[in-house]
């Protein structure tokens, strides 16, 4: 059953990244980054569409050269997802992608040279309503801050961000968001907590270079989870050395677990033991694979025996409790019918999809009525 999150989110200024609101009372946006060669337009477009299909709100694309900038323009024409151009040092690249339809510039003003270059980039962004993302990373702190602090610290990350923010403030440019990333969880969390009370702009959360799929998922879940529990964060990226599609799935799972945003089925399942009356693990693997295309939010409890099964099933939208000789299927918290092990997965998929269709029809009717 759907429950509201008890988390009180930090108040932030809202900006628009393409057609996606970020900050304010907007849903927390989930984003990823392509790992293709940007100059390979076809490969990059294919990956962006896969990321979008997984549910991403925004995608970032690295643009390291003018050749990549021209490729970015071709990519922009073939995808509908808001695109952030990741640019370092060369202000001309920023000006070019602004002309080509970028939705957000990830560029640190202090890294692009003379004030006239900074002014040119900010003017281009202002004229086209393009927000800027200030992205501070522990691995690329300014040398002066490295000397001052000796090593990356939360305070160093915040000071770096504030230097870039001061440049935007001098140009009266307020449409920006900020990220403060490190590969170390405690440092990242401390840095975000420090800056959250100092600025009103939205914050993009991430644990940078978190690692492969397993270790990166764990680090990101802990770090992002701690901040989100504090109400901090307006957009997130789970950085994994893995398929970017997996970043989106893990990102939504983090938000889903905190009841901040839901997409698809939220499975509740026991780890199984000798009391199970059906193969819980295989059933879960099959259902997750078969129902991966479902976007409708729903809690589904799959519990192998009667110890915890009835209690979990009663508070889920759909539930299954293992039993003998047959398993008991619950709908909206109430016993509905009994299911045989021989056809269990097929029956569950059918019943879940029927409920998904009913909810989608109900939502469509509400939308149609509101537009009359």
From Swiss-Prot:
<dbReference type="GO" id="GO:0051539">
    <property type="term" value="F:4 iron, 4 sulfur cluster binding"/>
</dbReference>
<keyword id="KW-0408">Iron</keyword>
<dbReference type="InterPro" id="IPR004588">
    <property type="entry name" value="IspG_bac-typ"/>
</dbReference>
<feature type="binding site">
    <location>
        <position position="270"/>
    </location>
    <ligand>
        <name>[4Fe-4S] cluster</name>
    </ligand>
</feature>
<feature type="binding site">
    <location>
        <position position="305"/>
    </location>
    <ligand>
        <name>[4Fe-4S] cluster</name>
    </ligand>
</feature>
<dbReference type="Pfam" id="PF04551">
    <property type="entry name" value="GcpE"/>
</dbReference>
<dbReference type="InterPro" id="IPR045854">
    <property type="entry name" value="NO2/SO3_Rdtase_4Fe4S_sf"/>
</dbReference>
<feature type="binding site">
    <location>
        <position position="273"/>
    </location>
    <ligand>
        <name>[4Fe-4S] cluster</name>
    </ligand>
</feature>
<dbReference type="InterPro" id="IPR011005">
    <property type="entry name" value="Dihydropteroate_synth-like_sf"/>
</dbReference>
<keyword id="KW-0479">Metal-binding</keyword>
<keyword id="KW-0411">Iron-sulfur</keyword>
<keyword id="KW-0004">4Fe-4S</keyword>
<dbReference type="GO" id="GO:0005506">
    <property type="term" value="F:iron ion binding"/>
</dbReference>
<protein>
    <recommendedName>
        <fullName>4-hydroxy-3-methylbut-2-en-1-yl diphosphate synthase (flavodoxin)</fullName>
        <ecNumber>1.17.7.3</ecNumber>
    </recommendedName>
</protein>
<dbReference type="GO" id="GO:0019288">
    <property type="term" value="P:isopentenyl diphosphate biosynthetic process, methylerythritol 4-phosphate pathway"/>
</dbReference>
<feature type="binding site">
    <location>
        <position position="312"/>
    </location>
    <ligand>
        <name>[4Fe-4S] cluster</name>
    </ligand>
</feature>
<comment type="function">
    <text>Converts 2C-methyl-D-erythritol 2,4-cyclodiphosphate (ME-2,4cPP) into 1-hydroxy-2-methyl-2-(E)-butenyl 4-diphosphate.</text>
</comment>
<comment type="pathway">
    <text>Isoprenoid biosynthesis; isopentenyl diphosphate biosynthesis via DXP pathway; isopentenyl diphosphate from 1-deoxy-D-xylulose 5-phosphate: step 5/6.</text>
</comment>
<dbReference type="GO" id="GO:0141197">
    <property type="term" value="F:4-hydroxy-3-methylbut-2-enyl-diphosphate synthase activity (flavodoxin)"/>
</dbReference>
<dbReference type="InterPro" id="IPR016425">
    <property type="entry name" value="IspG_bac"/>
</dbReference>
<dbReference type="GO" id="GO:0046429">
    <property type="term" value="F:4-hydroxy-3-methylbut-2-en-1-yl diphosphate synthase activity (ferredoxin)"/>
</dbReference>
<comment type="similarity">
    <text>Belongs to the IspG family.</text>
</comment>
<keyword id="KW-0560">Oxidoreductase</keyword>
<dbReference type="GO" id="GO:0016114">
    <property type="term" value="P:terpenoid biosynthetic process"/>
</dbReference>
<keyword id="KW-0414">Isoprene biosynthesis</keyword>
């Amino acid at each position: 059953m759907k429950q509201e999150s008890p988390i009180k989110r930090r108040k932030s200024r809202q900006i628009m990244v393409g057609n996606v609101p970020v900050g304010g009372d907007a849903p927390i946006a989930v984003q990823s980054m392509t790992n293709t060669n940007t100059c390979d337009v076809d490969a990059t477009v294919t990956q962006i569409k896969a990321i979008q299909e997984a549910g991403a709100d925004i995608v970032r694309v690295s643009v390291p050269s003018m050749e990549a900038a021209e490729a970015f323009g071709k990519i922009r024409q073939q995808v509908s997802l808001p695109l952030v151009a990741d640019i370092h040092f060369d202000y001309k690249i920023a000006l070019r992608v602004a002309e080509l339809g970028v939705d957000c510039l990830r560029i640190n003003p202090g890294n692009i040279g003379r004030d006239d270059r900074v002014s040119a980039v900010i003017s281009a962004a202002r004229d086209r309503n393009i927000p800027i993302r200030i992205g501070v990373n522990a691995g690329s702190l300014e040398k002066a801050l490295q000397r001052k602090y000796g090593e990356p610290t939360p305070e160093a990350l915040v000071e770096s961000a504030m230097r870039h923010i001061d440049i935007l403030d001098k140009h009266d440019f307020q449409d920006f968001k900020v990220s403060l990333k490190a590969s170390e969880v405690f440092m990242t969390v401390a840095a975000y907590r420090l800056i959250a009370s100092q600025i009103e702009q939205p914050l993009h959360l991430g644990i940078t270079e978190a690692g492969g799929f397993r270790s990166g998922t764990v680090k990101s879940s802990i770090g992002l989870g701690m901040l989100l529990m504090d109400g901090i964060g307006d957009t997130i990226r789970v950085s994994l050395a893995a398929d970017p599609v997996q970043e989106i799935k893990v990102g939504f799972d983090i938000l889903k677990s905190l009841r901040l945003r839901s997409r698809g089925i939220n499975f509740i399942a026991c780890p199984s033991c000798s009391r199970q009356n059906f193969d819980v693990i295989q059933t879960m693997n099959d259902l997750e694979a078969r129902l991966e295309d479902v976007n409708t939010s729903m809690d589904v409890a799959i519990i192998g025996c009667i110890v915890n099964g009835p209690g979990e099933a009663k508070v889920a939208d759909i539930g299954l409790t293992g039993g003998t000789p047959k398993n008991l299927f619950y709908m909206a918290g109430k016993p509905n019918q009994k299911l045989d092990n021989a056809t269990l997965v097929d029956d569950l998929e059918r019943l879940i999809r029927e409920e998904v269709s009913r909810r989608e029809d109900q939502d469509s009717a509400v939308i149609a009525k509101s537009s009359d």
